Design a protein with these regions (language model features):
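Charged, compositionally biased interaction regions
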Residues: 1-300
């Protein structure tokens, strides 16, 4: 329903924002955590201008992350999105962070209610007149990096998404359960979580062949990277669990980014606070069983 509403109102949005070619807000990201916009690209950085305009467009002001892509890009093809992030995004140049902006009240990962940082990713092709126009093609990593990363202590699974993009899963001791709300702070658990993420990040970045690993995603092991649904689950984890100001970690040259998408443990003692963390589903198993029985009896 949400995606249908987005398609229905797209003509109105394009009339108000003439640079917009297409727009997609994926269901898996709750509609307010990610937008993919294809923009006209007639002059340098037009995609960024388009994205910034949308961040001031009514309820789109609640967006956490917006990715600008080329005019011909199919915004609903998530494989094409990975291709664009891999081949067109230089971390030091093409990630724009807007600190202290308006957040959705349902953005539970934000450090303060209704306030968070926003992320604009420019995945458009540089055109003539842009200093990036003549830059060399962005390099990647050897396939063997996936095997090397799998052997690091604390990593459950590892998978290369693209040549510059690796996702790993891990178990966080005391991390929030998908079935329960976490209402109280756990300073020691949050400290262990931060230390584990830093340890995994540094271990991977120090691997041979990891110099061009521009994107490192770390998430919980409740996603199976060998399952058919892994892409859809990752999309939710990557964009709903992280906070731009708290969970993006850059290397010293700002050429690589580590994206922490593990479920945050509530605390006040870190660089930025973590608020209460809601369960993903709170349905009583007995109630679910009764509903299933009722549906079966009704032939539904």
């Amino acid at each position: 329903l949400g995606e249908a509403i987005g398609d229905a109102f797209l003509p109105v949005l394009k009339f108000q924002h003439r640079d917009v070619i297409d727009l997609f807000l994926p269901l898996e990201t709750g509609f307010h955590n990610l937008a993919i916009v294809s923009s006209k690209n007639r002059y340098p950085r037009q995609g960024r201008k388009t994205a910034l305009g949308l961040l001031g467009a009514g309820q789109m002001m609640f967006l956490k992350t917006i990715v600008a892509v080329n005019p011909e890009h199919d915004t609903k093809d998530l494989d094409l999105l990975l291709d664009a992030l891999d081949s067109k995004v230089e971390i030091s140049e093409d990630l724009v962070i807007l600190p202290g902006m308006v957040a959705d009240s349902l953005a539970h990962a934000s450090p303060w209610e209704n306030i968070h940082d926003k992320l604009l990713i420019d995945a458009t092709s540089p055109i003539e007149g842009d200093p990036r126009y003549l830059r060399a093609p962005l390099g990647g990593c050897p396939d063997s990096l996936e095997v090397s990363a799998s052997g690091i202590d604390g990593i459950v699974q590892a998978r290369m998404l693209r040549s510059s993009m690796l996702v790993v899963t891990t178990d966080i001791e005391g991390g929030p359960s998908p079935s329960e709300n976490v209402e109280t702070d756990d300073e020691e658990g949050a400290r262990r979580q931060r230390e584990k993420i830093c340890s995994i990040r540094d271990s991977i970045w120090n691997l041979e062949g990891a110099s061009n690993l521009r994107w490192l995603f770390i998430t919980d092991s409740d996603v199976d990277l060998s399952d058919d649904s892994w892409k859809r689950v990752l999309l939710w984890q990557f964009f709903c669990r992280f906070d731009v100001g708290r969970d993006l970690h850059f290397d010293s040259d700002r050429r690589r980014v580590c994206w922490d998408a593990t479920a945050p443990i509530p605390s006040q003692g870190g660089p930025l606070p973590v608020r209460r963390w809601p369960g993903v589903t709170l349905h009583d198993p007995e109630v679910l069983a009764r509903v299933d029985t009722w549906l079966q009896e009704g032939g539904l």
